Amino acid sequence: MATGTTTKMPMRRHTLFAVSACIGVAAFGAALIWRAPLAYSIGANVFFAAYLVLVIAHMPRLTGSYLRKNAGDTDLPVLAIFAVTLVVVAIAIISLFQLINREKSADAVELTVALLSIPLGWLTIHAMAALHYAHLYWLDGDAMDGDTKKRIPVGGLDFPGGKRPEGSDFLYFSTVIGMTAQTADTNVTTSQMRRVVLVHSILSFFFNTVIVAAAVNLAVSLGSL
C-alpha cells in the first residue's frame, strides 16, 4: 500500500479556460432567459471571475517541478484562447461605452456590472499571459550550466534569486508588464520570449488607454447628470 500524502495536481492550463468559458456561457444564457440588461457584460464578467478564481486557486500547485514536467501540455491552441478572450473583453468594453453614451441614464446596478468588466478583463488577460509565460519558459526543459554544472531552465526569463520560478513568479512578471509595459527586475534573455513580451506590452498599452478613455467618458457622463 502506498504511503505518504498525495498532492492534488492542478488542471491543465487550458482546462481552466474551458471550464471558465462554460460557466460564462451558462451565465450569459441565464441572463438572456431572465431578460436581464447587459447580458453580454454579465456573461463576460462571470467568465473573467471564474477564470481568475481558478488561476488563483491553482497558483500554489504550479511549482517549478510541475511546470518543468508538464510544459508541453497544449490541449487547445494558445492563439485561439487569446483571440476568444480579447473578443469577450471587446464586447464588455463596447457594452460599457454604449451604456455610458445612451440617452437614458443608467442605474447603479447597470453601471457596476459594466464597469466591472474592465478590471476583471484586465486581470484575466494578464493571468492568462502569466500561464503562457510559465509554460513557454519550461517548454524546452533544462540545460546544463557550464560553470556551475547544475541543470537550469532555458526558457528566456532571468528571475533574481536563483530559485526555480513558480506560478506566482510568472504572475508577478505578467502583471508588471501589464501595468508598465516594461520589465522590472526580471531580464528577458531569448528572442522568442522577447516577441511574446512585445506583443503583451503593446496589448497592455492599448488596454490601459481604453481604461483611461472609459474613465474620462464616465466622468463626463456622470457630470452631465
What is each residue range found by the language model?
Residues F28-A39, Q98-V113, S221-L225:
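Helix-coil boundary and interhelical linker segments in multi-pass alpha-helical membrane proteins
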Residues V88-L111, T175-S191:
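Alpha-helical transmembrane segments and their membrane-interface junctions
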Residues D169-V176, A184-S224:
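Pore domain of cation channels
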Residues P119-M144:
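Transmembrane alpha-helix/helix-exit interface in multi-pass inner-membrane proteins
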Residues L67-T85:
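Juxtamembrane helix-capping/reentrant segments at transmembrane boundaries
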Residues M9-L32:
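The first (N-terminal) embedded transmembrane alpha-helix
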Residues Y137, A143-N187:
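Membrane-proximal soluble regions of multi-pass membrane proteins
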Residues P37-V53:
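Loop-to-helix transition at the N-terminal end of transmembrane alpha-helices
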